[in-house]
Amino acid sequence: LDPGILEVNILLTHLHIDHIMGLGYFKPFYNPECTVNIWGPAGSSESLIERLRRYFSPPFFPVRFRELSAKINIHEIDNSTFNIDGFTIKSEYLCHPGPTVGYRCELGGSVVSFMPDHEPSLGSSDFPHLSEWCSGYNISEKADLLFHDGQYSNSEYDRRVGWGHSSVSDAIDFGNLSKVKKMVLFHHDPAHTDMQLEEMVDKSIQGKKIDF
């Protein structure tokens, strides 16, 4: 970051290690002139700050949370709406072990939705045909851009139902259901090659009418 930026907002979807392992190396934490606002969900039995303190402690990380130099503000969210520098941000719990939230960020009529870890078919008895009770639909509907979990192929997903991740096929169906304009698939299985990812997408869109 530009050293002249003295206030930063971090939006956490959840606290699995693959999503927070870089926090300890974030330079603004060590600048006493900086204010860092952290937004994220509390755990079922621990507050957000208690969960962050567990990460910022040995053996996970040598610097303890109380030793960080910046002024740190903790904001616990659930199904919430809040504002940051003109952005209206809506958070909503998603189907993923956690607890986990996704985000809908709105500014000037444009909408970006962010759901890196999400299993949309788990929360609905009639997915992908019915939006009611579909996890994440409320914060993705008609988004200009949706970032969405694309972890598995269909065969992989069949063996991992309930793990909190989406197949590429379900992610595309979710994008269609939500009527998004553009979609970015990510949070891929690290064992997949680029060629495999392309093949998964090609197979997932065969025979489907894609509206984005």
Put a short name on every predicted segment.
Residues L1-P116, S121-S124, Y137, D194-F212:
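Binuclear metal-dependent hydrolase catalytic cores
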Residues S121-I210:
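Cap/insert and terminal regions of metallo-dependent hydrolase folds
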